[in-house]
A protein has these predicted regions:
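Conserved glycine-rich cofactor-binding loop
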Residues: 13-14
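Substrate-binding pocket helix/loop in short-chain dehydrogenase/reductase
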Residues: 65, 90-91, 95-103, 129, ...
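Active-site loop-to-helix junction immediately N-terminal to the catalytic Tyr of the SDR YXXXK motif
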Residues: 94, 140-148, 160, 189
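Alpha-helical segment proximal to the catalytic Tyr-Lys
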Residues: 119, 163-164, 217
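Short C-terminal tail/terminal secondary-structure segment
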Residues: 139, 209, 220-234
Length: 234
């Protein structure tokens, strides 16, 4: 058990987060899965690990989740931060409350969990944090305004974190999915992708697993697009 690697997946009840939990478990990680729906609790138990029902917008829930993980395994090697869906509206119609909700959903989900888990990784002198972001960080779209703005902030946070903790062998990277099959399938969206298809949650999970692995030991502070060539910027 001392040699077992441990992964915590926050927001792992469905979609890309659940696929990441399954992939990491298949790669030999013991997994702890949190979601607000109860699906993460069921999945964690199905995979032989910990399942926890709680919110990534609650410091108390996150602390209990971390405490349960440490009580069982005594370490955390990987943290995967997923997110739900924030408000969408025409730009000038987004209220203060909606902006705050967007930042809670797409930025503070990472900041809260990282505050709790990073010190554990620093003490271990090893750890990897992978955040599920969006391909529209560099090319914002009015379709997802609060996501684009908050996750641009997440990109800056990731650089700051990477610079500060790289010497402790603790890494942070962002995965930037484009159109993924956990979203509604629309022909015009599919046709806008050079690969002419939606990506799969499993493809995102494979990228997350790579970034959490020793094969990515020299990668930190990066935003890795997994979008089928959708974004045109260099």
């Amino acid at each position: 058990m001392a040699d077992t690697k441990v992964a915590m997946i926050v927001g792992g009840g469905s979609g890309m987060g659940a696929a990441a939990a399954r992939k990491l478990a298949a790669d030999g990680f013991a997994v702890a899965v949190l979601s607000s729906s109860g699906k993460g609790e069921a999945l964690g138990k199905e995979l032989g690990g910990i399942g926890f029902t709680g919110s990534n917008q609650s410091n108390e829930d996150l602390k209990r989740f971390v405490d349960l993980t440490m009580e069982k395994w005594g370490r955390v090697d990987a943290l995967v931060n997923g997110a739900g869906h924030g408000p969408r509206a025409p730009l000038l119609e987004i209220t203060d409350e909606q902006w705050h909700t967007g930042f809670d959903t797409y930025f503070m989900n990472v900041a809260r969990a990282t505050r709790l888990v990073a010190p554990i990784m620093v003490a271990q002198k090893k750890g990897a944090i992978v955040n599920i972001s969006t391909a529209w960080v560099d090319e914002p779209t009015a379709l997802f305004p609060t996501s684009a703005v908050a996750r641009a902030g997440l990109a800056a946070y990731t650089k700051l974190f990477a610079n500060q903790y790289a010497a402790d062998n603790v890494r942070m990277n962002n995965v930037l999915p484009g159109w993924i099959d956990s979203l509604p399938a629309l022909d015009e969206r599919r046709d806008s992708v050079p690969m002419q298809r939606y990506g799969t949650s499993e493809e995102i999970a494979a990228t997350i697993a790579f970034l959490a692995s020793d094969g990515a030991a020299y990668i930190t502070g990066q935003n890795l697009r997994v979008d089928g060539g959708l974004m045109r910027s260099v």
